Amino acid sequence: ARIPLSSLNPEIERITAGKPHLYVLNKSDLADPEITRQWLAYFKSAGAGCIAMDSKQRGRATATKGLIEKELSALMERRRSRGMVGAAIRVMIVGIPNVGKSTFINSFAGTTRAKAANKPGVTRGKQWISVDSFDLMDMPGVLWKKFDSLETASNLAFIGSIRDDILDIEELACGLLSSVRGIYPQQLLARYKLDAEALTLPPYDLLQAIGAKRGMLISGGEVDTERAAKMLVGEFRASKWGRLSLERPPRRAIQEDREEVTDDAPQDDDWDDEQ
C-alpha cells in the first residue's frame, strides 16, 4: 500500500492482460490512510477492482472473497450456463517480493497454509492451496529485469522487496531520507528529536546527525553510519516513523496503461477453461 505504482509489475500486467484482476493494497496499516483512500478512488475510477487491507489481521482477507466473485461474475455465469456448477475458482496470488502474499493466503484460509516472513524470498516455489470454493496459487515474489526509473528501484528497495545484501545500506538510507523529508518532515523531526534546520542538511550529514542523536558512535567520537543506516531503514519498514506512503496516485488513468498492454498481448477468449 505504500508504493502501489512502483510495485505494479509490468511483466505480470502484460502476461495477464485481458484476465480479471483484483488489486490488493496489502500492509495498509503501514501506509498513510488518506493516501490509501486516494489510491482506492484512483483504481475505482479506472474500473479496476481494488481493496486495502492488513492481512495480518486474521480473517481480514476473507473480505476479498466477494470482490473476487464480482470480478469473475462473467466467468461464473458462463460456467453456470455450461452446467459447470461447483467447479473451484482458480486465483493466482502474484506480486513483488515481501508484500505479504503468503500472509494474505493464510488470512484468507483462516489458518497457516503458506510459510510467511517479513523478508523477501521465503516462498521458493508455486503451490496450490484449496480454500472453500477457491484454489489459490501461491507464487514466489517476482521482480522484472529492468526498472523504468531510479524512483521505482529505490521504492522497492526501501520497503525490502530487493535484498539488502546486494545494496549499499548507507546509500539506501540517504535515499530514503531524501524521499521522506520532503513529504513527511514532521515525522522525521519527531522520531529522531531533530530541529527543523537538520532537514536542510545533505542526506549523508542528516544520517550522521540521526546516528549521533542515537549515540551510535565509534572510537574517536565518529558516527557509525552503517549501523545508523540499518537502524533507520529498519525503523521505516517497521512503521516506527508513523504511517507513510511514498507514492501518490498519478494523473493518468491506469486503464490507459492496461489498454496499451492489452493491445499488444494475445487474447484468451476461453479463459474459463484454464481458470
Show which residues each predicted segment covers.
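Short coil/loop residues immediately preceding or within conserved phosphate-binding loops
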Residues: 86-88, 111, 126
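Glycine-rich phosphate-binding P-loop
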Residues: 90-110, 114, 139
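Helix-rich effector regions associated with P-loop NTPase G domains
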Residues: 1-21, 28, 34, 48-49, ...
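Short phosphate-engaging motifs
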Residues: 60, 100, 135
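Active-site phosphate-binding and catalytic loops of NTP-dependent enzymes
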Residues: 3-6, 74-81, 114-118
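Canonical P-loop GTPase G-domain recognition
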Residues: 19-22, 28-94, 215-217
